[in-house]
Amino acid sequence: MSRRKQSKPRQIKRPLEDAIDDEEEECPVEEAEVISKGDFPLEGSFPAGFEPENLSCEDVEFFCNKGDDEGIQEPAESDGDSHSDKPGQPGVETDDWDGPGELEVFQRDGERKIQSRQQLPVGTTWGPFAGKMDLNNNSLKTKAQVPMVLTAGPKWLLDVTWQGVEDSKNNCIVYSKGGQLWCTTTKAISEGEELVAFVVDFDSRLQAASHMTLTEGMYPARLLDSIQLLPQQAAMASILPTAIVNKDIFPCKSCGIWYRSERNLQAHLMYYCSGRQREAAPVSEENEDNSHQVSSLCPFPQCTKSFSNARALEMHLNSHSGVKMEEFLPPGASLKCTVCSYTADSVINFHQHLFSHLTQAAFRCNHCHFGFQTQRELLQHQELHVPSGKLPRESDMEHSPSGTEDSLQPATDLLARSDLSQSQKAMPTKDASSDTELDKCEKKTQLFLTNQRPEIQPAANKQNFSYTKIKSEPSSPRLASSPVQPNIGPSFPVGPFLSQFAFPQDITMVPQASEILAKMSELVHRRLRHGSSSYPPVIYSPLMPKGATCFECNITFNNLDNYLVHKKHYCSSRWQQMAKSPEFPSVSEKMPEAVSPNTGQTSINLLNPAAHSSDPENPLLQTSCINSSTVLDLIGPNGKGHEKDFSTQVKKLPTSNSSDDKINGKPVDVKNPSGPLVDGESDPNKTTCEACNITFSRHETYMVHKQYYCATRHDPPLKRSASNKVPAMQRTMRTRKRRKMYEMCLPEQEQRPPLVQQRFLDVANLSNPCSSTQEPTEGLGECYHPRCDIFPGIVSKHLETSLAMNKCVPVPKCDTTHSNVSCLEMDVPIDLSKKCLSQSERTTASPKRLLDYHECTVCKISFNKVENYLAHKQNFCPVTAHQRNDLGQLDGKVFPNPESERSSPEVSFERNMIKCEKNGNPKQPSPNGNLFSSHLATLQGLKVFSEAAQLIATKEENKHLFLPQCLYPGAIKKTKGADQLSPYYGIKPSDYIASSLVIHNTDVEQSTNTENESPKGQASSNGCAVPKKDSLPLLPKNRGMVIVNGGLKQDERPTANPQQENISQNTQHEDGHKSPSWISENPLAANENVSPGIPCAEEQLSSIAKGVNGASQAPSSGKYCRLCDIQFNNLSNFITHKKFYCSSHAAEHVK
């Protein structure tokens, strides 16, 4: 049969049944030649993982399966191998040889042995052989007889030398698998080396090894099935039979934990043993009764062992120091006692000196009970306890050896500090001048002790010495193996640390039986110890409800990892015994109060109606503003950072009512550690969170929870306050209410103009570097973008970097109108489409882009910019030009002398002033009059808009605006008298009228008559009145044309670019103020939507239905949204709009 080549030279075997073939003569010889040419490492070069004691069940099965997969198992042929016997071997009959060809039989001391005829690599397998294996537990000793009985099988297998499982001389394994016998080498076998095998029966799962493990351990011989195992123990017991047994273990009798090295056991006894916890009451009582036993107690605070004599105690101290008794310190090094000025040159001498302080000395300190041999040493030591330079009184010293001892804890703590710090110096791996916290404190104490005099001692040195700054828990000698962080002591008493993580130096290739049994004993030990321990059952008892409980914070965790993270980072016990944590210097122990010293109001009173001015005509606006001086205190890392910056402006406020303001219309919820909480949360005695049903032990922890972790921290501010019973109508809207399309397209000053009333205009102005401060009362036109809050620290992140504003100074010019507009903008989320422009961009800014719809439906041309779209509609669109010609022909019939009046700027200015004075505003109008024409004031439902238009016209320094205004009159469509007083702006019945208002005939006729009084061609330099034939508000669809064209016919309009138009228009203002660049001096005759010569309201309404951009189209077509008044030329865009963006969804987001 053919054999495939292999990458590594390895013996190829065949089943025993194939030995009859004729190939038996040539194959072993060829194989032997190939293998002999290969250089195989000897036994010592192979990894230790193939040692018998380190060979796991997985490794054995690997070798077994490897032989099975290769299909190479064999046994050699006796006839062919008989010719290859070495001549130097003793005469052995090979006629009966039935073993493999790589092996041969020889006799030594009259016994038949099996040896290798050539080098054999690890993993060489022979088999399978028919046979049965019977184990004899007594025969597993070294040099035992054959531990099995073969009912059938090869005879050579009986001649193999058998050893115990743990003998290191083993080089092969014989195992039973599936009722058949196999033999595999576990080491590299050289030529002529004897085969020494051990037995493993996989069918019986190593019953002998398991029994031996139980009988030779600490615990009595009990079978695992007789013990009630935990689920974790059952999993460990399943892999225990395959574990390697290690005799060199070091058990802890207190905990039942086995260690593979004595060093690990010593570290466990020092830091982690459950017996190391000191019981305070019994120890103190015992010491009070038996003061002579002080010398027999271990001075380490972590150890509770007692000894009968000093020698035994010295031997025990050796385990703490980690050095031998005979070792001396390096040359030039010394150990100084922190109790006195003694210096030792060896560790044993230093220990003996420490005993002198604990034994019955002649002089004993009354404070710490340390003993001293001379009075001078006692006086030097008592200097540490005296707060001033005075010597202690005679009553402080005791010349009697039988002094009362209240507690040994201070003495043992100080002794432990001195002993451990000096012992760490004595370690070879420790540097004598290390800069750890212990060494620093120790050096300071040593310097003080060596320089002091018994008579005179400065008081400053005494104050430098501090017992509390020295950590009582010493650092672990092996940082890599210690789960406790160095220099960080536990804040609660703990038992043994039961780590679930394996450290790198403890990870081995195969599982150790000692480790498995130790973990199993740990689980049992936890159950047995539960209930009798003095420390809290944090991680010891599986009988607890679930998880671990932090008793300081009264929080139960169902995951141990979460508990440990909580104790390390969040537990309230971290703040005990320290005013400020060194790791968190910016966090104080007490939460600072976010109350302004300049005002008696706090953030709790933000929604209190008694703290604000009342307006009987506007009951919904009584609590819409907060005290701005209170809000000013909410900035900065500690809540009072910018108080000085705003102190001068706050002093300028005339009255307390005049300082009422609100940021974006809602109480500020600043994300600061000292941020304001509502009334119930600021109670210093409140520790229970009703929303989360958690009770905290400290108010500070409760405050941190409410600020960062509470489930209600994302709710609107009014929803948080359970104590403030604010009426439903006084509450603001949701913070994250989504703005609709018609709201986004409005300038911020015009979204809710009816809420701007004259009685709220008496608030003094805050200085603003971006605006002028000459006029005391400003209009809506001067208000900055409401998203730019009045604090420099919380300017919205969507502001462009080119914003001409220094964030280190107060941003806004908070005028009278803004204090109310900001209230209106409160519930609107951040509009990322509204970018604040820089100063250079404000002078040349075009109208605000009308969403993203810039397509001329008549010409089927789309534009990327609004400027290009408007220019097209003004100059190139054929429908616009046609309407311009038609409207121009009507001008001569309706207005007899339009040119003469248009050419007279004085007359036009006078007429505009007359129309503005009719509305009650003596100020000069602004260009916003193009939107709110004077004829609109005659309409019954739009009188408020006329007032808003006059407020807008009170200031014309529009170049300082943060927001480039666009005169979008869509809000006129949805405003209806008193409805505008509601801050919700929900869906009203008037919103569903098809793109127009329901206007009474009398109102239309009155507006028509009023408009007929003014000539149509009047120039719009001041912008208050728009004399034209139109008597109805302009349609939102044509808002771009309204802004640019202004609704006037332009007979003398120069064909110049928008910048030139702006320059020419700015020169026409009488008050010398500049107008914004987006106001176009384009006096077209009339609006495209409305036919100018309509005498009655029915004809006017029918003219409104005239199509978008001048095209006659029914509003009820399939691509026209009547509610939003938007025409779509694509059905898919229309469907997407109705599904996601239509204003009909507004009611869905108001809760």
UniProtKB/Swiss-Prot annotation:
Biased amino acid composition, Polar residues: 401-410, 447-485, 647-658, 1004-1023, 1056-1067
Sequence segments annotated as region (Disordered): 1-53, 65-101, 389-486, 637-684, 1004-1035, 1049-1093
Localization in the cell: Nucleus
Phenotype of the disrupted gene, per the record: Mice die of congestive heart failure at 13 dpc with a syndrome of tricuspid atresia that includes an absent tricuspid valve, a large atrial and ventricular spetal defects, an elongated left ventricular outflow tract, rightward displacement of the aortic valve and pulmonic stenosis. These mice also display hypoplasia of the compact zone of the left ventricle.
Binding site for Zn(2+) 3: C689, C692, H705, C710
Alphabetized Pfam families for the sequence: CCHC_ZFPM2, FOG1-like_PR
Segments forming C2H2-type zinc fingers: 296-320, 335-357, 363-385
Keyword Acetylation among UniProt keywords: no
CDD domains reported for this sequence: PR-SET_ZFPM2
Location of the motif Nuclear localization signal: 736-740
Name of the protein in question: Zinc finger protein ZFPM2
Protein species of origin: Mus musculus (Mouse)
